[in-house]
UniProtKB/Swiss-Prot annotation:
GO terms for biological process: photosynthesis, light reaction. Pfam families: Complex1_30kDa. Keywords: Membrane, NAD, NADP, Plastoquinone, Quinone, Thylakoid, Translocase, Transport. The keyword Membrane applies. PANTHER family: NADH DEHYDROGENASE [UBIQUINONE] IRON-SULFUR PROTEIN 3, MITOCHONDRIAL (PTHR10884:SF14), NADH DEHYDROGENASE UBIQUINONE IRON-SULFUR PROTEIN 3 (PTHR10884). It catalyses: a plastoquinone + NADH + (n+1) H(+)(in) = a plastoquinol + NAD(+) + n H(+)(out); a plastoquinone + NADPH + (n+1) H(+)(in) = a plastoquinol + NADP(+) + n H(+)(out). It is a peripheral membrane protein. Its main location: membrane. This is NAD(P)H-quinone oxidoreductase subunit J. Gene3D superfamilies: NADH:ubiquinone oxidoreductase, 30kDa subunit.
Length: 176
């Protein structure tokens, strides 16, 4: 048994281990609860936080220098699965050729997808969170004007959810 424990890890298994990135290491050092995920194909670091820890983590990332929310969006992992609220942050500074980037993902239950709004940290979240609400039904608590953005106010359902059933007929009201 002792011999089995001391055997080196095969190279193929070693490659499959995900190494924490620079941002994840900084969050860990400063006591922020998160989970690091595999980086995307461009090498952008991805971290996962729970909805309860989004605001403290986002505030810390802003203080760390991630002063630009490039993109916020929703993702549906499939019928019966979780929804994801995703935030792509950039550290805009002197090195504009290769700015530091990180993506934060919050996995939410399909039945009650509620997450705090980051509008008060990055104003660019305003319409982006409204679009995620309109298309996926993700509720951003604390958003100053969370209402439909693209669909009519009386629209039923969330069109970009993978289990959405499109209505056979929708009557548009005359603008006059």
């Amino acid at each position: 048994m002792a011999e089995e424990e001391s055997k080196p890890v095969p190279a193929e298994k070693e490659e499959s281990l995900v190494q924490a990135g620079k941002v994840s290491q900084w969050l860990t050092e400063n006591g922020f609860d998160h989970e690091f995920l595999a980086p995307d194909k461009n090498g952008v670091e991805i971290i996962k936080v729970s909805a309860d820890f989004l605001l403290p983590t986002a505030t810390a990332l802003y203080a760390y220098g991630f002063n630009y929310l490039q993109c916020q969006g929703g993702i549906d992992l499939g019928p019966g699965q979780e929804l994801v609220s995703m935030y792509h942050l950039i550290k805009v500074g002197d090195n504009s050729d290769r700015p530091e980037e990180v993506r934060v993902k919050v996995f939410l239950p399909r039945e009650n997808p509620v997450v705090p709004s980051v509008y008060w940290i990055w104003k660019t979240a305003d319409w982006q969170e409204r679009e995620s609400y309109d298309m996926f039904g993700i509720i951003y608590e604390g958003h100053p004007n969370l209402k439909r953005l693209l669909m009519p106010e009386d629209w039923v359902g969330w069109p970009l959810r993978k289990d959405y059933i499109s209505p056979d007929f929708y009557e548009l009201q005359d603008a006059y």
